[in-house]
């Protein structure tokens, strides 16, 4: 009996897991014996290095990034956030009287019919479903009626999928720029040495808030009804850097974007750069619904617009772009340096400064084709039969998988639900050129000094005496 207890104690001791890597001596010995039996070396007892080899070659899943979303058990916080959108917000209590503080009148805002949009997408077999569409509409209503935010308009942009959690993105426009501070901002990234790559290209300024790529502000949350976070304005450097990398989102705004070339910011900045690119390429509207005001440059809605039939909405000619094109500079409006008086415009400006992109209200049929002469948009229908009277039609983007637009009657919408990865081949950048050891301009001369002539033999003899 004592022998059995001693064996059990020995096994228990060998099965104790290390706090560093989580392995045990028992598991290591099992792998070591399996390695020796598999290779069958001649002098197995002399190969003491096999133990170290087995330990070094063992795969550790903790060291690599997950390839699939990590299942997260729902907690009480997500449940409370989901329940909160179905009721009125809780009012603060006045400590003097013990009564709730009177609520401010709700803010007036503009928004699309999100329930009708969810029904259109549900008919086309895309989107997030009608049940989640109700929650999205209630969350957008909560944002729009908040008197502290004081938004002028709110629109559900879409949902970005992440490895640990997802992002629900709402596109808002504030009545006053100062009201933007009411929404908590995403934490600023920590500056890492060597993050900014040296480049001889001129620095491109950031577009002002309310213009170009920063015309709208984006609020994100991991669960509908949860706390909102305001994404920072996008910079041209971030847009250009995001075009050179492919990275899955983690669902954590403060995560470091570890890529080559280095991205100037954290995941909040990377998500904002993706939104700017996707918005410029996939936010569309039915043709003839808007007209461009030549004086103000803004879009005006037509009052006498007649929606086409459902299946006709599945044609690229039935949709137009309503967001300005994002140029190679990372801006919607090309920035040009000040031209010297004696300089030639064609020789002084580079290709990015001379770029001319498509104008507003350009039809989707004019979009660049994919390799193999494949169209950038493919049609989708609510029914394969043309005999069905009331149908919904739309288009699915092949450039940005997950971006769709659709309409049925007077109801239309466009939304993005995807991983934030563009359908384009990944072309890694070559390493940068070898840096110079020092600046040649600071060197006084590049010529070596001549060796002084040796003294005459007579002078050497006198010196010896």
From Swiss-Prot:
Alphabetic keyword roster: Cell projection, Cilium, Cilium biogenesis/degradation, Cytoplasm, Cytoskeleton, Flagellum
GO biological process, any: cilium movement involved in cell motility
InterPro entries the record matches: Radial_spoke
GO cellular component: motile cilium; radial spoke; radial spoke head
Disulphide bonds in the chain: none
Family annotation (Pfam families): Radial_spoke (PF04712)
UniProt-annotated stretches for the region Disordered: 184-209, 445-465
Compartments where located: Cytoplasm, Cytoskeleton, Flagellum axoneme
PANTHER family: RADIAL SPOKE HEAD 6 HOMOLOG A, RADIAL SPOKEHEAD-RELATED
Family: Belongs to the flagellar radial spoke RSP4/6 family.
Assembly notes: The radial spoke head is made of five different polypeptides (RSP1, RSP4, RSP6, RSP9, and RSP10).
Function: Flagellar radial spokes contribute to the regulation of dynein arm activity and thus the pattern of flagellar bending. They consist of a thin stalk, which is attached to the a subfiber of the outer doublet microtubule, and a bulbous head, which is attached to the stalk and appears to interact with the projections from the central pair of microtubules.
Record-given protein name: Flagellar radial spoke protein 4
Species annotation: Chlamydomonas reinhardtii
Gene name in the database record: RSP4
